[in-house]
Curated annotation (Swiss-Prot):
Photoregulated by reversible phosphorylation of its threonine residues. Chlorophyll a 3 binds at residues 144, 222. GO terms for molecular function: chlorophyll binding; metal ion binding. This is Chlorophyll a-b binding protein, chloroplastic. Chlorophyll a 6 binds at residue 254. It comes from Petunia hybrida (Petunia). The lineage of its organism: Eukaryota, Viridiplantae, Streptophyta, Embryophyta, Tracheophyta.
C-alpha cells in the first residue's frame, strides 16, 4: 500500500503541472475542487497526445479527513493517501515526489526504532522501581560490563544493522527486489509494500491481509504511536540531562511531592 500511496502522490504532483493542464487533462477541475473543499472521485480520462492516448487518474481527496489544524488547506502533495497524513508540511519537505517517498520511509523506520527505544526505557525502569527486576538504567547501560568489550559489540551491531538497512534501502530503490529469502530461496513474499514486508516474521497474526481501509487504519496507528514515541524518547533524554534521573524516577518523585517535584524545579536555583 505504501508504494501505491507514494505513486498516487507522485501522480498528483505531476498532474498539477501546467503541461498537464494544456494537454486537456482533468487536473484543472481536480485542483479547483481540492482547494474548494469538494470531494473528488477516482476516475479515468483519455487525453490524445500526438498519435497515441495516455490514461491518467484523478487522485481522491477527502475534504472530511482530519487535518493537523481544522479548516486549514493541506499542500497539494499531501492528499491523504499516506498513513498518518494530516496535511502538515510547513517547510514543504515533501513537495518533491522522490523526497516525499524517502521521508515517508525514514519516518516509518525511525518510528519503529523509537517505539522499541521507549519500551526499553520505560518498562525496565518501572519494573526495577517496583522491585520486579534489578536492571541498570538505560542511561548507564553503556557503562556496564558484558560478555565482550564495547568495541566488539559495536562492530557486531554495525554489521547486522548494516545488512538489514542495506536490504531495506534496496527495497526502497527497487520495490520487491528483496522479497526472496537469501538463505531459503523457496520462501518468497508477494504483494508486499515498501516498508511493510509482512510474512511470518513481520506479520505473524496476518493483520496486513485485511481490507485496504483496515490496513491503512493500522498503519496510521503505527505512525501516530511512533511519532509519540519519538517525542517520549527525546523527553526522557532531556529529563536525564537536567535531573540526572530517568522518567519513572521523576514520575514517582512528582507523585510523592507534586508541589515541589515539578519541571520548574529542574531550572530553579538550589
Amino acid at each position: 500500500m505504501a508504494s501505491a500511496c507514494a505513486s498516487s502522490t507522485i501522480a498528483a504532483v505531476a498532474f498539477s503541472s501546467p503541461s498537464s493542464q494544456k494537454n486537456g487533462s482533468i487536473v484543472g477541475a481536480t485542483k479547483a475542487s481540492f482547494l474548494g473543499g469538494k470531494r473528488l472521485r477516482v476516475s479515468k480520462f483519455i487525453a490524445p497526445v500526438g498519435s497515441r492516448s495516455v490514461a491518467v487518474s484523478a487522485v481522491a481527496a477527502d475534504p472530511d479527513r482530519p487535518l493537523w489544524f481544522p479548516g486549514s488547506t493541506p499542500p497539494e502533495w499531501l492528499d491523504g493517501s499516506l498513513p498518518g497524513d494530516f496535511g502538515f508540511d510547513p517547510l514543504g519537505l515533501g513537495s518533491d515526489p522522490e523526497s516525499l517517498k524517502w521521508n515517508a520511509q525514514a519516518e516509518l523506520v525511525h518510528s519503529r526504532w523509537a517505539m522499541l527505544g521507549a519500551a526499553g526505557i520505560f518498562i525496565p525502569e518501572f519494573l526495577t522501581k517496583i522491585g520486579v527486576l534489578n536492571t541498570p538504567s538505560w542511561y548507564t547501560a553503556g557503562e556496564q560490563e558484558y560478555f565482550t568489550d564495547t568495541t566488539t559489540l559495536f562492530v557486531i551491531e554495525l554489521v547486522l544493522i548494516g545488512w538489514a538497512e542495506g536490504r531495506r534501502w534496496a527495497d526502497i530503490i527497487k520495490p520487491g527486489c528483496v522479497n526472496t529469502d537469501p538463505i531459503f530461496p523457496n520462501n518468497k513474499l508477494t504483494g508486499t509494500d515498501v516498508g511493510y514486508p509482512g510474512g511470518l516474521w513481520f506479520d505473524p497474526l496476518g493483520w496486513g491481509s485485511g481490507s485496504p481501509a483496515k490496513i491503512k487504519e493500522l498503519r496510521t496507528k503505527e505512525i501516530k504511536n511512533g511519532r509519540l514515541a519519538m517525542l517520549a524518547v527525546m523527553g526522557a533524554w532531556f529529563q536525564h540531562i537536567y535531573t540526572g534521573t530517568g522518567p519513572i524516577d521523576n514520575l514517582f518523585a512528582h507523585l510523592a511531592d507534586p508541589g515541589h517535584a515539578t519541571i520548574f524545579a529542574a531550572f530553579s536555583p538550589k
